[in-house]
């Protein structure tokens, strides 16, 4: 088997014009693996540390030369000579080398860049697609490959846009499609329908970080209304063909045990119970199938009530709540909180820990949703990971911006390659709603 002969990190620029880490891993057989690390806007307080330089004279303090140096000077010497297929060992060595709970010594961006680049190098060396290679090295057993339902973020609010919409993401899920290809087509058509609707109403059609529109709408409900119109303009039926998903990012709205929603006409300040009632009211009006981070990451008592009241009607996703961390996630499972976990590779900082979080979800009867970050690159590995691990759902933005579309295009290629060995589950992908 091929061994690592060289690891090289560098500073590149992400989709928001900020620096990020890219890593090359070169093997003895000449194979190269290259990976770039994403970055979030709204981040959970317990996420693995993204190491930044802090030099205000350079990229406003957001440079990543320290992380790059850690790749080249600390990590590379420890991994050179190792067999590339020993991914778990490679990740364990880096985790031990860092020695902290949140990778605050080496930086999660340094560790993750190396981890993902090793996986790509291994797949290339073994002449396997990344999705197949990941299954092989982690012994993932499944007869079928599942293509994920795209949760397409077509209206951006909150931290992802400069407007008065409180909720961070309004997403559409094309559930009636027979294949991923058709689902993506449906999503693109609704996206274009929404642009037409917004233009006719005199709203701006500039896009946010994740490629969705960021109009200055009057309320959160109005965002759902214009999406309903867009679905009809595209020739689809709301609730049958297209259902909705929300990312509230409620931690960003939470202060002094209360939630403030500036976009609401009545009762801008809400308690946990008020928020749960607010979601209940939205469910009466709109076909919402999933709500992510509906309450703050620190409001576990509220989450318990939210789960008890709405788990039979909704997929309740923990993002900031669980931060792809198996220790935190296990605590949530034991306490009966949420019924789904968002999977972000850079929240935890290694491929092996990411796989462990997905496997923990399945054992507990939770769903797992593969996700991008608001700061992305041309790297499309999360598309492969969604298929490798059969997450059944993926969040990777709207139907614009190449940093988002490259993931969708990779899924198109994977579906074509797999043919009859793959399936698209549609509404059945939301299997934790019980």
From Swiss-Prot:
Entry-linked InterPro entries: Enolase, Enolase-like_C_sf, Enolase-like_N, Enolase_C, Enolase_CS, Enolase_N
> Which HAMAP family does its entry note?
Enolase
Task: Say which species the protein is native to.
Answer: Endomicrobium trichonymphae
The entry's active site is 210, 344
User: Would you tell me the protein name for this molecule?
Assistant: Enolase
What is the primary gene name for this protein?
eno
* Family, similarity comment: Belongs to the enolase family.
**GO molecular-function term, one example from the UniProt record:** magnesium ion binding
Q: Does the keyword Acetylation apply?
A: no
GO process annotations (BP): glycolytic process
Cofactors required: Mg(2+)
Lineage of the native species? Bacteria, Pseudomonadati, Elusimicrobiota, Endomicrobiia, Endomicrobiales
Chain sites annotated for binding (2R)-2-phosphoglycerate: 168, 344, 373-374, 395
Q: So what does this thing catalyse?
A: (2R)-2-phosphoglycerate = phosphoenolpyruvate + H2O
Checking CDD domains in the record gives:
enolase (cd03313)
Q: Can you tell me which residues bind Mg(2+)?
A: 247, 292, 319
């Amino acid at each position: 088997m091929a061994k690592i002969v060289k690891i090289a990190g560098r500073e590149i620029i992400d989709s928001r014009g900020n620096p990020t880490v890219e890593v090359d891993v070169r093997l003895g057989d000449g194979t190269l693996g290259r990976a770039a690390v994403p970055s979030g806007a709204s981040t959970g307080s317990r996420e693995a540390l993204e190491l930044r330089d802090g030099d205000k004279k350079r990229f406003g303090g957001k440079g990543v030369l320290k992380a790059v140096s850690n790749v080249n000077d600390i990590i590379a010497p420890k991994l050179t000579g190792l067999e590339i297929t020993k991914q778990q060992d490679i990740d364990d060595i880096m985790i031990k080398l860092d020695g902290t709970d949140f990778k605050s010594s080496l930086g999660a961006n340094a560790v993750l860049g190396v981890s993902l680049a090793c996986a790509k190098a291994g797949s290339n060396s073994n002449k396997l697609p990344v999705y197949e290679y990941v299954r092989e090295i982690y012994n993932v057993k499944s007869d079928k490959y599942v293509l994920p339902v795209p949760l397409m973020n077509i209206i951006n609010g909150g931290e992802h846009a400069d407007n008065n919409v409180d909720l961070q993401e309004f997403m559409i899920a094309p559930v009636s499609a027979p294949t991923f290809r058709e689902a993506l087509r449906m999503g693109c058509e609704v996206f274009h329908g929404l642009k037409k609707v917004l233009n006719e109403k005199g709203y701006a059609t500039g896009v946010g970080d994740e490629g969705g529109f960021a109009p200055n709408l009057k309320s959160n409900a109005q965002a759902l209304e214009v999406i309903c119109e867009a679905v009809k303009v595209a020739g689809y039926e709301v609730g049958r063909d297209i259902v909705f998903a929300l990312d509230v990012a409620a931690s960003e709205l939470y202060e002094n045990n209360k939630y403030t929603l500036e976009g609401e006409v009545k009762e801008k300040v809400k308690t946990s119970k008020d928020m749960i009632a607010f979601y209940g009211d939205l469910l009466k009006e709109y076909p919402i199938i999933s709500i992510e981070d509906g309450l703050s990451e620190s409001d576990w008592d509220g989450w318990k009530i939210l789960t008890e009241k709405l788990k039979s009607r909704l997929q309740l996703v923990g993002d900031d709540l669980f931060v792809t961390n198996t220790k935190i996630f296990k605590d949530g499972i034991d306490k009966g909180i949420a019924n789904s976990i968002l999977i972000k590779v850079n929240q935890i900082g290694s491929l092996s820990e990411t796989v462990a979080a997905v496997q923990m979800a399945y054992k507990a009867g939770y769903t797992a949703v593969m996700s991008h970050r608001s700061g992305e690159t041309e790297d499309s590995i999360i598309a492969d990971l969604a298929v490798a691990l059969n997450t059944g759902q993926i969040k990777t933005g709207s139907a614009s911006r190449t940093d988002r579309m490259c993931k969708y295009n990779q899924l198109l290629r994977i579906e074509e390659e797999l043919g009859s060995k793959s399936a698209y589950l549609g509404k059945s992908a939301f299997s934790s709603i019980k």
